[in-house]
From Swiss-Prot:
Main location: plastid
Function: S-sulfocysteine synthase that plays an important role in chloroplast function and is essential for light-dependent redox regulation and photosynthetic performance within the chloroplast. Probably unable to interact with SAT and to form the decameric Cys synthase complex (CSC) required for O-acetylserine (thiol)-lyase (OAS-TL) enzymatic activity. Lacks OAS-TL activity.
Domain of life according to the entry: Eukaryota
Similarity comment: Belongs to the cysteine synthase/cystathionine beta-synthase family.
UniProt cross-references to SUPFAM superfamilies, sorted A to Z: Tryptophan synthase beta subunit-like PLP-dependent enzymes
Protein name: S-sulfo-L-cysteine synthase (O-acetyl-L-serine-dependent), chloroplastic
Catalysed reactions, as listed in the record: O-acetyl-L-serine + thiosulfate = S-sulfo-L-cysteine + acetate + H(+)
Cofactor section: pyridoxal 5'-phosphate
Oligomeric and partner information: Homodimer.
Amino acid sequence: MAFASPSLRLLPQSPLGRITSKLHRFSTAKLSLFSFHHDSSSSLAVRTPVSSFVVGAISGKSSTGTKSKSKTKRKPPPPPPVTTVAEEQHIAESETVNIAEDVTQLIGSTPMVYLNRVTDGCLADIAAKLESMEPCRSVKDRIGLSMINEAENSGAITPRKTVLVEPTTGNTGLGIAFVAAAKGYKLIVTMPASINIERRMLLRALGAEIVLTNPEKGLKGAVDKAKEIVLKTKNAYMFQQFDNTANTKIHFETTGPEIWEDTMGNVDIFVAGIGTGGTVTGTGGFLKMMNKDIKVVGVEPSERSVISGDNPGYLPGILDVKLLDEVFKVSNGEAIEMARRLALEEGLLVGISSGAAAVAAVSLAKRAENAGKLITVLFPSHGERYITTALFSSINREVQEMRY
């Protein structure tokens, strides 16, 4: 499987390709509106608008203001140049509008950027994959679309008929919610009552119905409640993201290839949060398929790990633990501190999970054995989703106390 290098990604259908093509045609057309005459007082050719000659011919004056001595009729303009079929096709493609059919077509192809100021002491380069720039600001936008499309293609769900039900801690629910809104589905999400208020507000803004569950039961409590709702609701359907292979598939088909292409295959280490297991398994699986020597590193919170530690969380069925070369445990405090630094020093407003992934990436980049390597780290969500959390608690107090 081969992918074009970044330098070859400019296509006629791309916005920049269309602009470049149109500018070229505009420049060519504009040049035809000018004629050139020689100024005896200068060695330069003076560009004079053709319109001036036309006015001169009508008024009997030339563009220099003198009487026109010629009474002969002007020769008709030459016929336009003959274009080949290929040229006409290129022009037609270049004039295609760059407008998505709906918001789902904006998902994916997120940019990558080097980290520069939080990398003191690093021996390897670190490039971040900004999933925070998805249309609904999270890597979960990809699986929201993937799971809905897979279910539609199998005939399991139908817009304006099926009621979608899904347990979530916020980001996956939002990824499903905005796609459901665009396609015409009703959505019910179950979530622990401990989830921050802005995620609830965003879900409601997108039309989702929210059912809160006992926070002490964690995500498992939300899963159990979702199953209960499905049994009681007509035409209800539950995606079961933790066991849904569409979760992994979309990252194998899109996220992995995007990283491979943007790095021109030079990635050495891939770092991502474990979460549902879909991102790290799908993306890591593709990268290892392309180069078996690429290391895949999973990141999990030390307070509630799913693989290691004394407080195991909910182990996703789609997580391929054997794919992981290493697992990093990062504390909530470390993740918050790094997320704040990313905003202040890199201009990247990202969430707590992104901070955790960055902590792991920086630690790896300081190892002697990784000197000169390229580490790619996935930032899964935007910082605006964490305004009322501990990430911005001090700023929240500061702005609340502001007076005019």
